[in-house]
A protein has these predicted regions:
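Short beta-strand-turn/beta-hairpin segments enriched in glycine/proline and small hydrophobics
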Residues: 1-17, 34-50, 77
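Short, well-structured beta-strand-loop connectors
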Residues: 24-35, 62-72
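Short histidine-centered loop motifs in beta-beta connectors
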Residues: 20-24, 57-60
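Short, compositionally biased
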Residues: 48-57, 81-82
Length: 82
């Protein structure tokens, strides 16, 4: 079995303000783990990790304004291949 790494880029699904960041570069995350929250129109939208892996970078900090499709984070995912 061979292990390969893929990079997953997490984009903002909507315009808003970064309300909370729960992870930092180097942290290990699991698929569907909440990694940050965006606030828009007084509603909080959680952002979840799309895969298991390690946080490579966080492109935002709490209080930042973001636009739809801005890069929020990058995760190095691990996948197994036979």
């Amino acid at each position: 079995m061979r292990r390969t790494a893929m990079t997953q880029t997490i984009l903002a699904p909507l315009d808003g303000k970064v309300f909370q960041v729960m992870v930092k570069p180097g942290d290990t995350v699991e698929e569907d783990e909440e990694i940050l929250v965006i606030e828009a129109m007084k509603m909080e939208t959680p952002i979840f990790a799309p895969c298991d892996g390690a946080v490579k970078e966080i492109g935002v900090k709490e209080g930042d304004d973001v636009l739809e499709n801005d890069i929020l984070a990058v995760i190095d995912s691990k996948s197994n291949e036979v």
